[in-house]
Protein backbone atom coordinates (compact mmCIF):
# COMPACT_ATOMS: atom_id res chain seq x y z
CA UNK A 1 0.00 0.00 0.00
CA UNK A 2 2.88 2.35 0.82
CA UNK A 3 4.32 1.67 -2.62
CA UNK A 4 1.02 2.71 -4.20
CA UNK A 5 0.93 5.99 -2.23
CA UNK A 6 4.55 6.77 -3.07
CA UNK A 7 3.94 5.97 -6.74
CA UNK A 8 0.86 8.20 -6.82
CA UNK A 9 2.77 11.02 -5.13
CA UNK A 10 5.57 10.74 -7.68
CA UNK A 11 3.14 10.64 -10.60
CA UNK A 12 1.21 13.65 -9.34
CA UNK A 13 4.41 15.62 -8.82
CA UNK A 14 5.40 14.97 -12.44
CA UNK A 15 2.11 16.11 -13.94
CA UNK A 16 2.74 18.93 -16.36
CA UNK A 17 0.37 21.83 -15.84
CA UNK A 18 -1.89 22.44 -18.81
CA UNK A 19 -2.29 25.81 -20.40
CA UNK A 20 -5.72 27.24 -21.08
CA UNK A 21 -7.23 30.46 -22.38
CA UNK A 22 -10.60 31.93 -21.46
CA UNK A 23 -12.59 34.99 -22.42
CA UNK A 24 -12.05 36.36 -18.92
CA UNK A 25 -8.27 36.30 -19.40
CA UNK A 26 -8.53 38.18 -22.70
CA UNK A 27 -10.23 41.05 -20.86
CA UNK A 28 -6.93 41.83 -19.07
CA UNK A 29 -5.89 44.96 -20.99
CA UNK A 30 -2.44 44.95 -19.38
CA UNK A 31 -1.59 41.75 -21.22
CA UNK A 32 -3.95 41.59 -24.23
CA UNK A 33 -5.09 44.17 -26.77
CA UNK A 34 -8.23 43.84 -28.85
CA UNK A 35 -7.71 44.92 -32.42
CA UNK A 36 -10.97 46.35 -33.64
CA UNK A 37 -12.26 46.07 -37.18
CA UNK A 38 -10.83 42.65 -38.07
CA UNK A 39 -13.92 40.48 -37.51
CA UNK A 40 -15.44 41.39 -40.86
CA UNK A 41 -13.38 38.74 -42.62
CA UNK A 42 -15.70 35.95 -41.48
CA UNK A 43 -12.86 34.53 -39.40
CA UNK A 44 -14.28 35.41 -36.02
CA UNK A 45 -15.74 38.08 -33.81
CA UNK A 46 -12.67 39.81 -32.48
CA UNK A 47 -8.92 39.50 -32.58
CA UNK A 48 -6.74 39.94 -29.52
CA UNK A 49 -2.96 40.02 -29.43
CA UNK A 50 -0.73 39.03 -26.56
CA UNK A 51 1.32 42.21 -26.05
CA UNK A 52 4.21 40.30 -24.49
CA UNK A 53 4.47 37.86 -27.40
CA UNK A 54 5.42 40.38 -30.09
CA UNK A 55 8.95 39.73 -31.36
CA UNK A 56 10.50 41.63 -34.28
CA UNK A 57 13.60 40.91 -36.34
CA UNK A 58 15.22 41.93 -39.60
CA UNK A 59 15.43 39.43 -42.44
CA UNK A 60 17.38 39.31 -45.69
CA UNK A 61 16.86 41.73 -48.61
CA UNK A 62 14.97 44.38 -46.68
CA UNK A 63 12.42 42.06 -45.10
CA UNK A 64 11.20 42.41 -41.55
CA UNK A 65 9.63 39.66 -39.48
CA UNK A 66 7.17 39.93 -36.64
CA UNK A 67 6.00 36.99 -34.55
CA UNK A 68 2.87 37.36 -32.44
CA UNK A 69 0.35 35.24 -30.56
CA UNK A 70 -3.17 36.20 -31.49
CA UNK A 71 -6.52 35.01 -30.20
CA UNK A 72 -9.63 34.99 -32.38
CA UNK A 73 -13.10 34.67 -30.84
CA UNK A 74 -15.31 32.19 -32.68
CA UNK A 75 -18.79 32.78 -31.21
CA UNK A 76 -20.58 30.23 -33.40
CA UNK A 77 -18.53 27.47 -31.76
CA UNK A 78 -18.03 29.15 -28.36
CA UNK A 79 -14.31 28.82 -28.92
CA UNK A 80 -11.14 30.88 -28.90
CA UNK A 81 -8.45 30.12 -31.48
CA UNK A 82 -4.87 30.70 -30.40
CA UNK A 83 -2.51 31.25 -33.32
CA UNK A 84 1.20 31.87 -33.13
CA UNK A 85 1.83 33.65 -36.41
CA UNK A 86 5.01 34.78 -38.13
CA UNK A 87 4.51 37.74 -40.48
CA UNK A 88 7.16 38.55 -43.08
CA UNK A 89 7.09 42.05 -44.57
CA UNK A 90 8.85 42.70 -47.89
CA UNK A 91 9.41 46.45 -47.76
CA UNK A 92 10.16 46.48 -51.51
CA UNK A 93 6.41 45.87 -52.02
CA UNK A 94 5.18 48.74 -49.84
CA UNK A 95 3.02 51.36 -51.56
CA UNK A 96 5.71 53.98 -50.99
CA UNK A 97 8.27 51.84 -52.84
CA UNK A 98 5.88 51.04 -55.67
CA UNK A 99 5.14 54.75 -56.09
CA UNK A 100 8.88 55.37 -56.13
CA UNK A 101 9.17 52.78 -58.94
CA UNK A 102 6.37 54.55 -60.79
CA UNK A 103 8.19 57.88 -60.47
CA UNK A 104 11.40 56.34 -61.86
CA UNK A 105 9.43 54.68 -64.70
CA UNK A 106 10.07 51.14 -63.47
CA UNK A 107 6.29 50.71 -63.46
CA UNK A 108 4.28 51.96 -66.43
CA UNK A 109 1.10 53.24 -64.77
CA UNK A 110 -0.95 53.36 -61.60
CA UNK A 111 -2.79 50.33 -62.94
CA UNK A 112 0.52 48.42 -63.03
CA UNK A 113 1.19 49.56 -59.47
CA UNK A 114 -2.24 48.36 -58.35
CA UNK A 115 -1.87 45.02 -60.14
CA UNK A 116 1.57 44.53 -58.61
CA UNK A 117 0.13 45.12 -55.14
CA UNK A 118 -2.81 42.78 -55.83
CA UNK A 119 -0.45 40.04 -57.02
CA UNK A 120 1.99 40.41 -54.13
CA UNK A 121 0.85 42.39 -51.09
CA UNK A 122 4.36 42.32 -49.65
CA UNK A 123 3.16 40.54 -46.52
CA UNK A 124 3.18 36.81 -45.97
CA UNK A 125 2.29 34.84 -42.88
CA UNK A 126 2.62 31.36 -41.55
CA UNK A 127 0.97 29.75 -38.56
CA UNK A 128 3.65 28.33 -36.29
CA UNK A 129 1.29 26.88 -33.67
CA UNK A 130 -2.48 26.59 -33.35
CA UNK A 131 -4.76 25.66 -30.44
CA UNK A 132 -8.48 25.87 -29.82
CA UNK A 133 -10.09 26.52 -26.43
CA UNK A 134 -13.69 26.63 -25.30
CA UNK A 135 -14.58 30.11 -24.01
CA UNK A 136 -14.56 28.71 -20.46
CA UNK A 137 -10.85 27.90 -20.82
CA UNK A 138 -10.91 24.15 -21.50
CA UNK A 139 -8.76 23.04 -24.41
CA UNK A 140 -10.19 20.98 -27.27
CA UNK A 141 -9.03 17.41 -27.59
CA UNK A 142 -6.06 16.63 -29.81
CA UNK A 143 -8.12 15.02 -32.58
CA UNK A 144 -10.27 18.13 -33.10
CA UNK A 145 -7.18 20.30 -32.79
CA UNK A 146 -5.38 18.36 -35.53
CA UNK A 147 -8.40 18.76 -37.83
CA UNK A 148 -8.64 22.48 -37.06
CA UNK A 149 -4.91 22.96 -37.60
CA UNK A 150 -5.23 21.60 -41.15
CA UNK A 151 -8.04 24.09 -41.81
CA UNK A 152 -6.16 27.07 -40.36
CA UNK A 153 -4.87 29.43 -43.00
CA UNK A 154 -3.62 32.96 -42.75
CA UNK A 155 -3.81 34.59 -46.17
CA UNK A 156 -2.59 38.16 -46.34
CA UNK A 157 -4.38 39.47 -49.40
CA UNK A 158 -4.15 43.16 -50.13
CA UNK A 159 -7.09 45.17 -48.81
CA UNK A 160 -8.62 42.48 -46.62
CA UNK A 161 -8.79 42.03 -42.84
CA UNK A 162 -5.57 39.99 -42.64
CA UNK A 163 -3.69 42.75 -44.45
CA UNK A 164 -5.09 45.41 -42.13
CA UNK A 165 -4.15 43.33 -39.09
CA UNK A 166 -0.58 42.82 -40.34
CA UNK A 167 -0.29 46.56 -41.06
CA UNK A 168 -1.50 47.34 -37.55
CA UNK A 169 1.12 45.02 -36.06
CA UNK A 170 3.85 46.55 -38.23
CA UNK A 171 2.88 50.02 -37.05
CA UNK A 172 2.83 48.86 -33.42
CA UNK A 173 6.37 47.45 -33.73
CA UNK A 174 8.06 49.94 -36.07
CA UNK A 175 6.01 53.11 -35.51
CA UNK A 176 4.93 53.53 -39.14
CA UNK A 177 2.43 51.80 -41.43
CA UNK A 178 3.99 49.15 -43.68
CA UNK A 179 2.82 50.87 -46.86
CA UNK A 180 4.55 54.12 -45.84
CA UNK A 181 7.99 52.46 -45.65
CA UNK A 182 10.52 53.43 -48.32
CA UNK A 183 13.32 50.89 -48.66
CA UNK A 184 16.78 52.23 -49.30
Please identify what each model-predicted range represents.
Residues 1-22:
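Classical Sec-dependent N-terminal signal peptides that target proteins to the secretory pathway
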Residues 20-84, 90-184:
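N-terminal secretory-pathway/extracellular module detecting exported/lumenal segments
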Amino acid sequence: MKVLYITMALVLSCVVPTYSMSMQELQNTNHYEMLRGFGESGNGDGTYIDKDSIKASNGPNGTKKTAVTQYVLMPADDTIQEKQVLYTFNTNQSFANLIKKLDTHQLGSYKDLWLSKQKNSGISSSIIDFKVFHVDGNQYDAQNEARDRRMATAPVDFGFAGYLLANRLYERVYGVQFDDVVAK
